[in-house]
């Protein structure tokens, strides 16, 4: 059988080993050191909005710290986009808080501003005002930033911007990862750049970054001995892994262009085909890195048939994220919406999108698509 075509596999740029070797040569193996500092500066320079970045062990850790920094505690309610990966919602439970899930809108597949406001009004009247909003740029597609911000500001609720999938995307020329009161990034192995495993917290002030780093290094107080006046976490990024990130940052823009080219391959392929929709930017204000290219088919049955046809040729594809309000672990929590995310999940499929896919890989994908849609 031919080699596997992955949905989104790591793509090294060439200089990752140089930074890793420097870490070994200088014995900076711990979760601190020149690569960590350099990686944070590289991201800050790239985002270019006067932000401060704390490199962490995962995007999940970054969301957890964001909730702590915003004062989320037991029994607080936190609004969360339902159509996302579970890592967006799990940290709410870590804090013994209560998630309130909100549906997507049909253009970007991200949080619906109308459903968001409905949720805020309902919870404020029946319980208490939610303490934070976690909103996601799904598959690299920016959410409706202005509309979501308008609702959040109207009710004075801070936004945690989950930009785990959207490094390299932008809205009205501003980089994703800079729109939240606190924002997060992910560098998991399947992301547009990787540190093997890793993430980052992005803030607007140096003081908040320093607080995040303090919490991420077991909240050790300034003392000659180990002194702790609050609970901390082991969430800092390894200097070795940060070296991978420094090499990856050098090729980020190239990776974005390659993924956008792969997305255009699918747009062109399906452009004259009825019943198949490719996720695309709704206007020139939106610029997606197209981390994953996703389509919506006519039915669940057709979606599954295509997935299995690709699988039979050793080509990975994957259904869209199953909404959190449909997950067994979250079914007891409130949901506000009209079924958009459920419909997308039932009919949607992510197709191979990696920046390292070859012409031969594209041809193999095309052959399967041709046979399926003939």
Where does each model-flagged region fall?
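PLP-dependent aminotransferase class I/II
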Residues: 34-41, 49-54, 114, 118, ...
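Short, conserved catalytic or interaction motifs in soluble domains
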Residues: 58, 104, 189, 217, ...
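Conserved coil-to-alpha-helix start sites within the AMP-binding
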Residues: 84-89
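Phosphate-binding glycine-rich loop
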Residues: 32-77, 91-94, 101, 125, ...
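Active-site phosphate-binding strand-loop segment of PLP-dependent enzymes
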Residues: 107-195, 200-202, 207
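A short hydrophobic/small-residue beta-strand
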Residues: 78-79, 92, 99, 159, ...
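N-terminal "arm"/small-domain region of PLP-dependent enzymes with the aminotransferase-like
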Residues: 1-30, 352
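Short beta-strand->loop structural element characteristic of the AMP-binding/adenylate-forming
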Residues: 81, 98-108, 318
